[in-house]
Design a protein with these regions (language model features):
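Extreme N-terminal starter segment of soluble prokaryotic enzymes
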Residues: 14-18
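Active-site beta->alpha loop and helix N-cap motifs at the rims of alpha/beta catalytic domains
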Residues: 3-6, 20-38, 42-169
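Catalytic alpha/beta core domains of metabolic enzymes, predominantly
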Residues: 146-150, 155-205
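A general structural signal for short secondary-structure junctions and capping/turn motifs
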Residues: 8-11, 39-41, 195-198
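Extended hydrophobic/aromatic-rich secondary-structure runs
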Residues: 1-13
């Protein structure tokens, strides 16, 4: 009986394969209506809900979009927290602007400002700078944080998987062009297995 329950739980965890966006430009009525209904129907397949977050030093996203006012930013965060509370799907804050300077000043600013999200339950984050993660400062301040890399870094090689895992990333987004390269995907899978053997397991997407 216990083994059956464990297998069922394990199966449910592995079927959570989709990371879905919370689009800040959607009408709140649509989010609370059709989108919420969709999430409730399919939440067993959804890994997390991600939203682009604007806070210093990430005041623009990777495309330079600055449509947020402070009030709009708070509305997005509040809506994300509400969706997560209703659906029980974890939230993921996305900071993907690779053009933000990866210096210590920016890292200190991020660590200070992220506390407001961490304290309300946001425990997954996408970050653009490997050098920040490599310092261990973020992990020390936020020990329960699960860290993703940004897809904008275009990870395509097995050695990059190993380097990112060693740096401290828990989840690695692969470049989408790899979907057409079966041989390279096999090499990527072997790199993932190597990371697990060395004590720094990662999830790939």
């Amino acid at each position: 009986m216990a083994q059956t329950k464990f297998r069922s739980f394990y199966s449910r965890m592995w079927q959570k394969i989709f990371s879905l966006p919370i689009n800040p430009k959607l009408d709140p009525k649509d989010i609370k209506g059709e989108y919420l209904n969709f999430l409730m129907r399919n939440k067993d397949w959804i890994y997390d809900l991600y939203f682009t977050c604007r806070m210093p030093p990430f005041t623009q996203d990777a495309m330079g979009d600055v449509f947020f006012t402070d009030d709009m930013e708070m509305q997005v965060i509040e809506m994300a927290l509400w969706l997560s509370d209703i659906t029980k799907i974890p939230l993921s804050a996305t900071f993907n602007n690779i053009y933000v300077r990866p210096d210590q000043k920016g890292l200190d600013m991020f660590i200070s400002n992220f506390k407001q999200l961490y304290d309300v339950g946001v425990k997954i984050v996408t970050l653009p700078h490997t050098s920040w993660v490599l310092t261990g400062q973020i992990q020390k301040e936020y020990p329960e944080l699960y860290i993703k890399n940004t897809i904008l870094r275009e990870v395509t090689r097995p050695n990059e998987i190993v380097q990112l895992a060693q740096a401290g990333f828990n989840y690695i987004n692969l470049d989408r062009d790899l979907m057409r390269d079966r041989d390279r995907l096999i090499e990527i899978k072997e790199a993932k297995e190597y990371c697990a053997e060395q004590g720094y397991p990662v999830k790939l997407s």
